[in-house]
């Protein structure tokens, strides 16, 4: 057993369960896993083409530490399949696959899961070790408590601590030392990873009731609506996620084979590819599908398919900080970006594929979404000849 896990353990690491991990002890008797990542997919859904996109803000924010430490970030972008020229477009977005690949490149090149943003390096393999420990935990509360104990083994500590009240539970960020995170990416990442990892382990979404941040609403704050799907509070006295206490008793339903598969692909997809099937937003996107060339289903049909009333569905979408019209618009935007990356498709054909009968209307809508025309966006995707 690792030191620091004697209090209510139930979570044990046995190398025989993880024979493929190159385990060696360090000077403190702790487990070190050198060089353990080979890519990322979310929740074992690697083969599914994702139609989700990620704001260029998160691409640039993820690169801040690498730039500060002198890495060639343009080369990192190219390795991830992202043209550096695309980032010149103010409202550019990349596919979730591209963003996931960028996370892999950063961690592999830097050997630091904090990507140069934390108060110290987090060696590649730290997340894998924590996951191997918590898979034997009986329920979500035990997962979060043991994960926090694991994080305390490293100084300065960067972690999330579980606090339990009468009806509510909170995951509260604990960050010691000086962080180099001007764009808040490290803090956002830790919240997202701990929340989505817990949801995966218990096989159900941990429905958030509130997300708090101890900094002013950032310029990219609108993106938070689609990340947390709950009310947001900025300039709070802490960074925390609040949810119903009942989730803490939910049993861990994943087993070691599932975790081994999960660790081949995580945690980058926890950041880039949220399990939106657990939200009304995601369910509506799934019902609409990817064929946007035909008339889309109306709101009443969608509500019936989801076994709810239109009034209730509107209220739930409001709780998720969105609307039916916004879901349709963003789905068209994301699919248009996906098709534009396929250079062989004429732009007029793309307009029809995403539901526009008039190319001029598509051009206006796309410029509203991204700040540039479809043609200019494609040029940015293609990059300069030197790329």
Regions found by a protein language model. Name each.
Residues 3-171:
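N-terminal low-complexity or simple alpha-helical regulatory segments
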Residues 46-64, 151, 157, 175-177, ...:
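Surface-exposed, interaction-prone regions with an acidic/low-complexity signature
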Residues 79-83, 214, 353:
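Short acidic/histidine-centered micro-motifs embedded in hydrophobic/aromatic stretches
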Residues 103, 144, 191-194, 288:
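Hydrophobic alpha-helical core bundles mediating ligand binding, dimerization, or RNAP-core interactions
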Residues 128-134, 176-180, 248-249, 269-271:
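Short hinge/gating elements
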Residues 159, 163-248:
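DNA-contacting interfaces and partner/effector-binding or oligomerization modules
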Residues 218, 223-387:
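Extended mid-to-C-terminal alpha-helical interaction segments
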């Amino acid at each position: 057993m690792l030191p620091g896990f004697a209090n209510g353990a139930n979570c044990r690491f046995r190398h025989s369960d993880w024979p493929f991990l190159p385990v060696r002890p360090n000077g403190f008797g702790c487990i070190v896993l050198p060089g353990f990542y080979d890519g990322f997919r979310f929740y074992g859904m690697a083969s599914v083409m994702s139609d989700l996109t990620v704001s260029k803000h998160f691409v640039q924010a993820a690169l801040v530490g690498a730039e500060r430490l002198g890495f060639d970030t343009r080369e990192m972008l190219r390795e991830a399949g992202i043209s550096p020229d695309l980032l010149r477009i103010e409202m550019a977005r990349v596919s979730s696959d591209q963003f996931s690949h960028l996370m892999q490149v950063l961690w592999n090149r830097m050997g630091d899961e904090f990507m140069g943003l934390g108060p110290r390096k987090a060696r590649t393999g730290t997340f894998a070790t924590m996951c191997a420990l918590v898979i034997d935990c009986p329920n979500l509360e035990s997962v979060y408590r043991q994960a926090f104990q694991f994080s305390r083994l490293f100084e300065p500590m960067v972690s999330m601590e579980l606090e339990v009240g009468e009806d509510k539970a909170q995951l509260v960020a604990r960050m010691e030392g000086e962080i180099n995170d001007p764009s808040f990416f490290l803090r956002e990442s830790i919240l997202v990873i701990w929340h989505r990892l817990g949801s995966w382990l218990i096989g159900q979404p941990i429905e958030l009731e509130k997300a708090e941040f101890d900094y002013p609403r950032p310029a990219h704050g609108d993106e938070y609506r689609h990340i947390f799907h709950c009310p947001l509070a900025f300039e709070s006295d802490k960074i925390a996620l609040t949810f119903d206490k009942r989730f803490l008793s939910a049993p861990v339903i994943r087993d070691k084979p599932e975790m081994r598969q999960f660790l081949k692909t995580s945690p980058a997809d926890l950041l880039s590819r949220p399990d939106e099937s657990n939200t009304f937003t995601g369910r509506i996107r799934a019902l609409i599908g990817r064929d946007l060339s035909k008339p889309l289903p109306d709101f009443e049909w969608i509500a019936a398919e989801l076994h709810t009333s239109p009034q209730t569905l509107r209220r739930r979408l409001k709780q998720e900080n969105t609307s039916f019209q916004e879901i349709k618009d963003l789905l068209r935007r994301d699919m248009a970006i996906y098709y534009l990356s396929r250079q062989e498709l004429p732009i007029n054909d793309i307009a029809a594929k995403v539901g526009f009968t008039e190319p001029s209307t598509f051009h206006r809508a796309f410029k509203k979404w991204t700040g540039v025309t479809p043609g200019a966006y494609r040029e940015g995707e293609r990059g300069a000849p030197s790329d």
